[in-house]
């Protein structure tokens, strides 16, 4: 009898230990993100609060993100693709539909950032952060007010112009300058954009990316095409620099939170997305990263100077002229690549 009791006691102890271990075991979600795209300490706080571990992996652009998501090497649970990549992933059936009952904070997002053409009704995505591509200029070197893409072609600024070394962005700038749609695939319009970029090169224009900061701070370049986060941060730190969104409009991009198809941790992924949609989380991301927030409450927490800065939160008439990138199919992409090759050669 004692032997039976002893065995039964050991069985209970082992069972209790197994249950305890299972309870303490953390769910792990894989988060595919851009580098420096989340507020410091935010993931640690989420892990502590929800007992869910976040394994963060970084990529540099949408194409690299697509490769990661489709390679089959890692099953990601949450990712942050840009607008046109969201559209592509949806069209290929690579995203899970969101259960918004598990993401109640989505109702606090600004309506102006919802129901976009790349995901009508936000069935598969919710906005995480947004921004524009505009112009930064040195007010000590340029006395006039800059307000148009045409200023990037002004002969007065010969040897002072900087353009992002990005096929889609540079061609998009030229299309907006000429009054054409940002996503045009029309042969005539693309040919005109190519001619405009070649003319711009004759003004001593240089192409680059990260070096724009140093060139603008030092005064080696007086006017540049730049991402709004970098532009607004530089303008905040250096009084002689100013960031604007041109009157013709620009690329209005939205990085969105999505759940890749095949996740085994959908509930945990939605918990994480809901956490990132909280006011405090959204505010901290906007303050640290420098881009504008799609969260209404977080926006209202920002300094009045930020809220009233047209480079950050644009006037409605300029906002209405802004466009998001659309996904280009292989044939359309080849047209852009041909234009870009001829511009850069």
Regions from the PLM with identified roles:
Residues 85-88, 217, 223-240:
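A ligand-binding cleft/hinge motif common to bilobed small-molecule-binding domains
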Residues 22-89:
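Early extracytoplasmic/lumenal segment of secretory-pathway proteins
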Residues 190-199, 238-261:
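Periplasmic-binding protein-like
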Residues 1-29:
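Short, low-complexity disordered leader/linker segments with a strong preference
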Residues 134-141, 176-179, 253-266, 284-288:
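A bilobed periplasmic-binding-protein/Venus flytrap-type ligand-binding module shared by bacterial periplasmic
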Residues 260-320:
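Mature extracytoplasmic/periplasmic domains
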Residues 316-345:
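Conserved C-terminal helix/tail region of periplasmic/extracytoplasmic solute-binding proteins
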Residues 39, 75, 79-220:
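Extracytoplasmic ligand-binding site segments that recognize negatively charged/polar headgroups
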């Amino acid at each position: 009898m004692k032997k039976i009791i002893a065995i039964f006691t050991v069985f209970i102890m082992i069972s209790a230990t197994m249950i305890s271990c299972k309870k303490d075991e953390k769910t792990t979600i894989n988060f595919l993100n851009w580098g420096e795209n989340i507020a410091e300490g935010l993931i640690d706080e989420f892990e502590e609060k929800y007992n869910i571990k976040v394994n963060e992996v970084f990529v540099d652009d949408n194409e690299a993100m697509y490769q990661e998501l489709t390679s089959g090497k890692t099953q990601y649970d949450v990712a942050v693709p840009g607008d046109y990549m969201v559209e592509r992933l949806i069209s290929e059936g690579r995203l899970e539909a969101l259960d918004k009952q598990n993401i109640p904070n989505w109702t606090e997002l600004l309506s102006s950032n919802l129901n976009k053409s790349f995901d009508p009704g936000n069935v598969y995505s919710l906005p995480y952060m947004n921004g524009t591509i505009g112009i930064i200029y040195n007010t000590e070197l340029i006395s006039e007010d800059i307000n148009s893409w045409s200023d990037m072609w002004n002969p007065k600024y010969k040897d002072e112009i900087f353009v992002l070394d990005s096929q889609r962005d540079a061609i998009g700038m030229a299309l907006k300058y000429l009054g054409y749609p940002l996503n045009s695939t029309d042969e005539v319009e693309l040919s005109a954009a190519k001619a405009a970029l070649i003319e711009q090169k004759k003004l001593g224009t240089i192409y680059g990316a990260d070096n724009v900061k140093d060139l603008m701070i030092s005064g080696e370049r007086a006017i540049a095409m730049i991402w709004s986060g970098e532009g607004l941060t530089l303008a905040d730190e250096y009084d002689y620099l100013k960031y604007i969104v041109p009157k013709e409009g620009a690329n209005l991009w939205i990085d969105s939170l999505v759940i890749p198809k095949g996740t085994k941790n959908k509930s945990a992924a939605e918990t994480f997305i809901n956490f990132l949609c909280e006011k405090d989380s959204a505010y901290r991301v906007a303050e640290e990263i420098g881009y504008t927030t799609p969260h209404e409450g977080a926006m209202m927490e920002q300094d009045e100077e930020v809220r009233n800065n047209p480079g950050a939160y644009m006037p409605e008439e300029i906002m209405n002229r802004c466009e998001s990138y659309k996904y280009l199919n292989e044939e359309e992409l080849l047209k852009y690549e041909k234009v870009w090759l001829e511009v850069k050669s």
